[in-house]
Amino acid sequence: MKIVFNALSARLGGGQTYLINLFEFVPANEDLEILVFAPTTLKLPDHPRVRRVEPAWPTENPIVRALWEKWVLPSILKAEKADVLFCPGGVVGTRAPVGCKVVTMFRNMIPFDLRVRKSIPFGLQRLRNWLLNRIMLKSMSEADLTIFISNYARSVIESLTKVKNAVTIPHGIGSVFRTHGGSTVRPDYLPESEYVLYVSRFDVYKHHYEVVSAYGKLSQELREKFPLILVGETNLPEAERVKSLVSTLGLEGQVLLLGAIPYQSLPPLYHHAYLNLFASSCENCPNILLEALASGRPMICSNIMPMPEFGADAALYFSPFDSDDIGNILSEALSSPDLLRKLSAAAIAQSDKFDWENTSRKTWFELLALAERPKQGV
């Protein structure tokens, strides 16, 4: 049995994190062989059944990669007698040979969120998302199996096209984020006081602007007691807009933009937060929300799906489009220690439902089950 991974598009953290965890739990099947096309930055396990294959083409270029997937990969699949081609990036640009089944995955929600797409200025990025919408729909409608990572995302796609065979397998939470009940060293760059934490890249649909506006409406007493810490790259246009708002509202010293923090350094920030906040309105599986819950600290969160699907009763919810609503929920949370204790306990219980080992085993089960189906046309 041979499964080929086309993971050449997995160049950023989220896509690589998924694959690293998946390969950590490779099944014990002796007849299983796994071939992986992936960037050299993706560290693969030293496993006898996992083999990295380097394309002869310079596939770092997305156009060259698309041509390689269309013209070269089919012949490789045929020569290797592959049973399954898995494209976790969500785009299938390869016509698999007879007998080789195709699996894709839906992770990128932006091409299917019209509000977000309209917020992107006219140009290549806007065109790219328009094209991705159509290419991904085609990929999912033609695949032998589509893996969804939230029921909400599945409902969106199934309202737009017929999916032959689908399964929902949410992402897990890395053990490094499960700091509740333990202790972590408090980073020196954190304020000595309690703080409210929001970790996310700066973009319009992350609603930092509305969050800062809401924070500015809190009482001076609450603002002095609980500074707002924003973690994310600050060299983006939306970050500049937020910086300008902080200055206009006179919140310097109370709203702190720490910039980008390495992924592995985030757990102590969640762990030491008095309150975690997540205000995104466009997600597929909100990893930041899950990782924050795993710290056992209380959470207030966007009420836009799929956030309630993952947060359940472990968060207080607000409309990310309404700074007054955000402010009211923020004030309620910061003024109610008993409520926060309940949310903290609920966060621990909810986060325990999401585990990378469970995610990986379910995924391998589906891949192997598909591979074992009788081949058609041979």
Please place each PLM-identified region on the residue numbering.
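Aromatic "clamp/platform" in nucleotide-sugar-dependent glycosyltransferases that forms part
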Residues: 281
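A conserved mid-protein helix/loop that constitutes part of the nucleotide-sugar donor-binding site
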Residues: 16-24, 203-217, 240, 324
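Glycosyltransferase donor-sugar binding loop
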Residues: 37-42, 173, 227-241, 259
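Active-site donor-binding acidic/aromatic loop of nucleotide-activated sugar
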Residues: 237-239, 252-262, 269, 316-317
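Short hydrophobic beta-strand element within catalytic cores of glycosyltransferases
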Residues: 294, 298-301
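Membrane-proximal helix-turn-helix segments that form the acceptor-binding/catalytic region
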Residues: 74-75, 125-146
